Amino acid sequence: GAATGSGGEIRDRLAGGKGSLPLAGTAVYMTSYSRIQKNSKKGSFAERDWLYQNPTDILIKASNGASDFGNKFGQPLIAGSILTFEHKENNQLLGYDKVIMLAGGVGYGKKYEAEKGIPKKGDKIIILGGDNYRIGMGGAAVSSADTGKYGNALELNAIQRSNPEMQKRVSNVIRALVESDINPIVSIHDHGAGGHLNCLSELVENTGGTIEIDSLPLGDPTLSAKEIIGNESQERMGLIISPKDTKKLKKIAERERAPLYIVGEVTCDERLVFKNDTKKEVPIDLDLSALFGSSPKTVMEDSSVFREFKAIPYSQDKLFSYIKQVLQLEAVACKDWLTN
């Protein structure tokens, strides 16, 4: 899951404008206290049941995942931070039980290609990357939901799996197009949260398009139409190019050994259609306004909560002990083991 955070952030930058190029990554972690040092402030917090994994495992494995993806893809993780916090008082326990990992990065794009183009009728819709599997079903929705709202099995089923080698191949194709004298990309979008439904609908949000489900590559033939359309199998990019440029794109994809699929075309009828000619099914046929024009408005109201905490007792002759405890906190100590 952590590796796909770094991988997804790279794809976000690849999808900037008509294509952009990633340079370096960053990572930030927020968890409750780890239980490593028994003689520190954290030692006063006993082990307890964790909803997911304990903070120590998260900090070690998540950072390993983020760094590992960058190493395999060829992008360094150069900076970041960590915050650990936990406090118990008045029968209340405050802490990060649903941990936070923020993946970020640095990249660049050409100024005159900063805005996406408007697709024309007949333009081809392309998928670059791997096959569809029963992976990451509902991942984006689950990650944004209240902790424990879904069962553990469902939440674990929502975790994506990374494939940095595939992403490198796809990235090389996009890089070749971006660095060309004439970039044929009309519009580009990353695959991630929401799978094909999110990616392909946003590619044609101003025009409409038809997607051939038969043309979407299946790694698992048992997938239902919903699973094919909504899975979040990683390392895929969607783009739109003119029919005359497909030959050039295919040659580059073959050179980089990146799977390429022409899965549909722009229709300019302001409808999004997913159809399966083999099974004579049309699982999705929606007016674009149903997806983009009438999104419900979320109203969030906050209220200030005032809490009073007892003064912390201390003894001046224990000053060095206190300093040692503070320096043992991950939020204070050197963070290179996580961020470099």
Positions of PLM-derived features:
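Glycine/proline-enriched, intrinsically flexible loops and inter-domain linkers
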Residues: 1-340
